[in-house]
């Protein structure tokens, strides 16, 4: 908590600004370009930057993104929407990470082989119309994408439509979205629920069915503070 309180050459604001706008040149070259534009005469070495960066709490970027998102929706004069709601999408992907001991300890490897590459899961909630990332995270390789989606939905608001792919087929997640005040659209595999299988065999164009939580789903709901109740859904 005592970092960045003294008047150093590389203060908190300059460090954050540099990280956010760093280009593709060498680290030292980027430092020279940056300080030539913001504070002429200052000389910061790459090693000094590395030392300062280790002291920077990564949560600062989460706070900055949250503030930026709130500012955008509060002040933008021409926010694009679809009717009266935002169209949000959740998706995740596996990401190969740098191969060093600290990264492996934090995120794990692609498999149990000792020479397997470090792997993480990135996940995000994205406003597809306005092209704004509302929430994102990078997580260990064994993280549950469904749980990550649930945490992202905490950034959704009343009336939002959340779009999810076939990997997010769990009932407790649907309940969590609805109880946050948002709606959802999910591409379900046929074998996701028996009601979906029956609908697919019926040759009907659409149907309203009720999904009932199993004992396992009820426990998952309890763990996450979700009310485990039957859910009426429209299949098309």
Kindly give the residue locations of the regions a language model identified:
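A glycine- and small-aliphatic-rich helix-loop capping segment at beta-alpha/alpha-beta transitions
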Residues: 106
């Amino acid at each position: 908590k005592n970092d960045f309180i003294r008047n150093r050459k590389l203060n908190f604001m300059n460090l954050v600004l540099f990280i956010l706008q760093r280009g593709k040149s060498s680290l030292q070259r980027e430092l020279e370009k940056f300080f030539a534009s913001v504070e002429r005469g200052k000389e910061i070495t790459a090693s000094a930057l590395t030392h300062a960066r280790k002291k920077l709490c990564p949560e600062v970027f989460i706070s900055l993104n949250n503030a930026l998102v709130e500012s955008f929706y509060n002040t933008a004069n021409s926010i694009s929407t679809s009717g009266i709601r935002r169209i949000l999408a959740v998706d995740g992907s596996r990401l190969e990470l740098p191969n060093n001991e600290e990264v492996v300890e934090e995120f794990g490897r692609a498999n149990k082989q000792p020479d397997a590459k470090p792997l993480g899961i990135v996940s995000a909630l994205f406003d597809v119309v306005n092209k704004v990332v509302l929430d994102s995270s990078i997580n260990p390789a064994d993280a549950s994408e469904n749980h990550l989606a649930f945490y992202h939905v905490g950034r959704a608001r009343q009336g939002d439509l959340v779009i999810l792919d076939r990997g997010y087929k769990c009932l407790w997640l649907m309940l969590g979205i609805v109880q946050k005040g948002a709606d959802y659209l999910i591409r379900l595999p046929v074998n996701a629920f028996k009601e979906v299988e029956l609908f697919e065999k019926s040759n009907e164009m659409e149907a309203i069915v009720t999904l009932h939580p199993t004992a396992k789903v009820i426990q998952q709901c309890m763990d996450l503070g979700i009310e485990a109740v039957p859910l009426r859904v429209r299949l098309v």
